[in-house]
Every structure is written in C-alpha cells, then in structure tokens.
Amino acid sequence: MMHRLCLLGTLLALLISSPTSAADTPGYKQKHAEMLYTVVLVRPSNGSGSGTVIWSEPDRAGEYHSLILTNHHVVRQAIKIEAAWDPKLGKKVDREKRNLVRAEWHVYNDYSHMVGSKSSRAEIVAYDAKLDLALLRLIDRERRVTPVAYFLPEDEPIYMFDEVTAVGAGLGEPPFATQGNLAFMDKIIEGENYFLSSAPIIFGNSGGALFRYSPERKRYELIGVPSKVSAAGWQAVSHMTWSIPIDTVRDFLRGNCYHPVVKEPLDRELCASWGELKASGK
C-alpha cells in the first residue's frame, strides 16, 4: 500500500510541475540575441524584405548611428530619379531622391511567443545595384540598438557542409530561422560571387542574414546575405538559396567609407569627405 502511495505521489508531482522555460534551455538566449534579434523586417512603400543590424555607435556629439544591411532590390523602389530644375544650369536635370523606409523589430516573451513589435524610420545612405547591397541608417539618433550581428573574421574560411542558419522575414512575417548546410562555393551570378546553402528561404528573406556558429569564439557570426532563390520554371526551389559572401559586404562598406563597421580606421585619403560620415564616430 505504501509503495502505491509513493508511486501516486511521484506521478502527481510530475503532472503539476511547471514546464521548463525556454530561457532555461542552453543556447536559446544566445540564439535569440545573436541571430533572431539582429534581423529586422524592412518595409519600403511597397513590399517587404529583411535587414541585419550591423552597427550602432555614438558619434562625437553623442548621437547614435545605427546601420542596417540589406539588399538593394529590397529598397530599390524607394530610390527614384526625378527631373528637377537647376537654377545654375538653367535647365532640368535628373536628380536622385531616396525615400525613407521602415525597419521593424519584434518582441518575444519567454523566447518563444511574440508579444509586440516596434519600428523606426530609416534612410538609405549607400547602395550598389551591381552588388545588390544597400545600407540603411535609422533616423532615431537617441538610442543605441542592441543586439548587433557579429561578422565572421576576415580571411577565415568557410567550407561545404558547414551548418548554417538563415534568418529573415519571409513573406513579410516576423523574422524566423531555418537550418541547412553550405552546399556550393564560388558561383558567379551576373558577374558577382555567391555561395549556395540548403537553409530554405522564400520571398521576403532577401537582405536577411546567414549565420554560422564559431566554436572558437562561442558565438554566431554573419557569413552572408541571403539574396536569391533558385527556380525551376515558375516554381521556387527554396532549399537552394544563394547568399552574398561577407567579404563582398566588407568591400561594399569600405567602398562607401564605412571602415569602422569592419573594425578598421577610416581611410581618409580614400574618403575625402570623411568628416561628413557620421557613422564613423571619428
């Protein structure tokens, strides 16, 4: 009889015990902080895409400059060429106009349940249509944005079969993660280098992030920007996705005088207008 009572007590204890919180599970907090929370939903006037927070530091005046990396094709419709009258030339000339876009973050409870979102306007401060990259800067200068994605260190190799995680706002949904492996390297598409992964993405993931975990540094690092989905006829092949390598991202940032983002001093000889580049903090 006593044995039965003990067994019944054990079963009751199991039934009424509180479930383990996701926050108590090893790795949940790190995955959210270093991957999910660094990726935002980017909303131009039409459509949507993804972006990754790569920098948020103050300048000498104490204003924060927060930068979001995305694809050019995500914000392409916000860049317009309009004819405007030039009084000095006495004629109409084509001038570029860049409309603001919105960046949207999502807030989670217990690392699982979305409880809300927040957004901020952002300006397009740089882009390269050929590389299909663009850089956004938040209008809000009062607050630091955290967390910020880690970059894969320069010259560190990546290999086929490396496990990777793609994070993006597919179909305009809040950013979510998919897993896969690096599958093919050094694919030239429209003259630029891409690599293939099997982490599924879909329309709206463009401009997001592809991460790989570093056992050495014990952190998730940005290795590429998911940009293209393979297709067979009109059918998207979502598990064959092409990403822009992080080395191309570095070249893009350097070429637009954002050297501090890649942990380098500003090249003042190359960037004659370095004093106007607020994001340098110099």
Model feature map: region roles:
Residues M1-L5:
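Positively charged n-region of N-terminal signal peptides that target proteins for export
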Residues C6-S17:
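Bacterial N-terminal signal peptides
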Residues A22-E63, L67-N71, A78-K80, D132-L133, ...:
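N-terminal activation segment of mature serine protease catalytic domains
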Residues T38-V39, H65-N71, P157-L171, S197, ...:
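Active-site-proximal beta-strands of protease catalytic cores
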Residues S48, A61-A84, N99-M160, V164-V167, ...:
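Conserved active-site neighborhood of the chymotrypsin/trypsin-like protease fold
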